[in-house]
Amino acid sequence: MINFGSCWGLASVTSNSFSIISGFSSNSVSHAHDMGLVPDLPPTVAAIKNPTSKIVYDEHNHERYPPGDPSKRAFAYFVLTGGRFVYASLVRLLILKFVLSMSASKDVLALASLEVDLSSIEPGTTVTVKWRGKPVFIRRRTEDDINLANSVDLGSLRDPQQDAERVKSPEWLVVIGVCTHLGCIPLPNAGDFGGWFCPCHGSHYDISGRIRKGPAPYNLEVPTYSFLEENKLLIG
């Protein structure tokens, strides 16, 4: 038979023992904390264990990161907005310029080519026309000029070229009138070879526009051209 009195007494003893143990444990930790044996919890851990909605004012962070001046914030916003506007304007301008360059007008295309009437040019004379901002020499050569141009030994030339490679019609020589040395304009019907002479540094070109003497490294450049009719020349 079960003795309820004995069980109740045992339960009381157990409960009292647990209370004593709990009190001993709590008191032991408290005394250990007071004596410095248990370190303080880090602030982050303490904040998690004891959450609070109170705003803590940190004077140290306030000194390191002072609040901004409203006028300065407005100025920074103004500068940032203005910079974005300028950047967008530049991008728009570049795109517009690219589109316009891709669709050249008739005036631009007309300047890219030049039509010349050759009927008024006498044999043995040279005329100068302007094409793309550069002078172009057009010489109507005589039979003697043609024979002289074809009698040159190519081995003696600095920039070897046959006369036939530089003309489309033996009677007409078309070259850009810019010295290949430093860009001066040579004088026609001058020099030691009856062609052109550059007064800047003394380069001599023959009747085919080939460099024969002086510092120029290359012959006078031959532009792109074609004959529209017998007396019509299209440069470009």
Curated annotation (Swiss-Prot):
<dbReference type="GO" id="GO:0005743">
    <property type="term" value="C:mitochondrial inner membrane"/>
</dbReference>
<dbReference type="InterPro" id="IPR004192">
    <property type="entry name" value="Rieske_TM"/>
</dbReference>
<protein>
    <recommendedName>
        <fullName>Cytochrome b-c1 complex subunit Rieske-4, mitochondrial</fullName>
        <ecNumber>7.1.1.8</ecNumber>
    </recommendedName>
</protein>
<dbReference type="GO" id="GO:0016491">
    <property type="term" value="F:oxidoreductase activity"/>
</dbReference>
<feature type="binding site">
    <location>
        <position position="179"/>
    </location>
    <ligand>
        <name>[2Fe-2S] cluster</name>
    </ligand>
</feature>
<dbReference type="Pfam" id="PF02921">
    <property type="entry name" value="UCR_TM"/>
</dbReference>
<feature type="domain" description="Rieske">
    <location>
        <begin position="146"/>
        <end position="234"/>
    </location>
</feature>
<comment type="similarity">
    <text>Belongs to the Rieske iron-sulfur protein family.</text>
</comment>
<keyword id="KW-1133">Transmembrane helix</keyword>
<comment type="function">
    <text>Component of the ubiquinol-cytochrome c oxidoreductase, a multisubunit transmembrane complex that is part of the mitochondrial electron transport chain which drives oxidative phosphorylation.</text>
</comment>
<keyword id="KW-0812">Transmembrane</keyword>
<keyword id="KW-0813">Transport</keyword>
<dbReference type="GO" id="GO:0008121">
    <property type="term" value="F:ubiquinol-cytochrome-c reductase activity"/>
</dbReference>
<keyword id="KW-0411">Iron-sulfur</keyword>
<dbReference type="InterPro" id="IPR006317">
    <property type="entry name" value="Ubiquinol_cyt_c_Rdtase_Fe-S-su"/>
</dbReference>
<keyword id="KW-1015">Disulfide bond</keyword>
<dbReference type="InterPro" id="IPR036922">
    <property type="entry name" value="Rieske_2Fe-2S_sf"/>
</dbReference>
<feature type="binding site">
    <location>
        <position position="181"/>
    </location>
    <ligand>
        <name>[2Fe-2S] cluster</name>
    </ligand>
</feature>
<keyword id="KW-0999">Mitochondrion inner membrane</keyword>
<keyword id="KW-1278">Translocase</keyword>
<dbReference type="GO" id="GO:0006122">
    <property type="term" value="P:mitochondrial electron transport, ubiquinol to cytochrome c"/>
</dbReference>
<feature type="disulfide bond">
    <location>
        <begin position="184"/>
        <end position="200"/>
    </location>
</feature>
<dbReference type="InterPro" id="IPR005805">
    <property type="entry name" value="Rieske_Fe-S_prot_C"/>
</dbReference>
<feature type="transit peptide" description="Mitochondrion">
    <location>
        <begin position="1"/>
        <end position="24"/>
    </location>
</feature>
<comment type="subunit">
    <text>Component of the ubiquinol-cytochrome c oxidoreductase (cytochrome b-c1 complex, complex III, CIII), a multisubunit enzyme composed of 3 respiratory subunits cytochrome b, cytochrome c1 and Rieske protein, 2 core protein subunits, and several low-molecular weight protein subunits. The complex exists as an obligatory dimer and forms supercomplexes (SCs) in the inner mitochondrial membrane with cytochrome c oxidase (complex IV, CIV).</text>
</comment>
<dbReference type="InterPro" id="IPR017941">
    <property type="entry name" value="Rieske_2Fe-2S"/>
</dbReference>
<dbReference type="GO" id="GO:0051537">
    <property type="term" value="F:2 iron, 2 sulfur cluster binding"/>
</dbReference>
<keyword id="KW-0679">Respiratory chain</keyword>
<keyword id="KW-0496">Mitochondrion</keyword>
<dbReference type="InterPro" id="IPR014349">
    <property type="entry name" value="Rieske_Fe-S_prot"/>
</dbReference>
<keyword id="KW-0472">Membrane</keyword>
<feature type="topological domain" description="Mitochondrial matrix">
    <location>
        <begin position="25"/>
        <end position="73"/>
    </location>
</feature>
<keyword id="KW-0809">Transit peptide</keyword>
<dbReference type="GO" id="GO:0045275">
    <property type="term" value="C:respiratory chain complex III"/>
</dbReference>
<keyword id="KW-0479">Metal-binding</keyword>
<keyword id="KW-0408">Iron</keyword>
<dbReference type="GO" id="GO:0046872">
    <property type="term" value="F:metal ion binding"/>
</dbReference>
<feature type="transmembrane region" description="Helical">
    <location>
        <begin position="74"/>
        <end position="96"/>
    </location>
</feature>
<feature type="topological domain" description="Mitochondrial intermembrane">
    <location>
        <begin position="97"/>
        <end position="236"/>
    </location>
</feature>
<feature type="binding site">
    <location>
        <position position="201"/>
    </location>
    <ligand>
        <name>[2Fe-2S] cluster</name>
    </ligand>
</feature>
<feature type="binding site">
    <location>
        <position position="198"/>
    </location>
    <ligand>
        <name>[2Fe-2S] cluster</name>
    </ligand>
</feature>
<dbReference type="Pfam" id="PF00355">
    <property type="entry name" value="Rieske"/>
</dbReference>
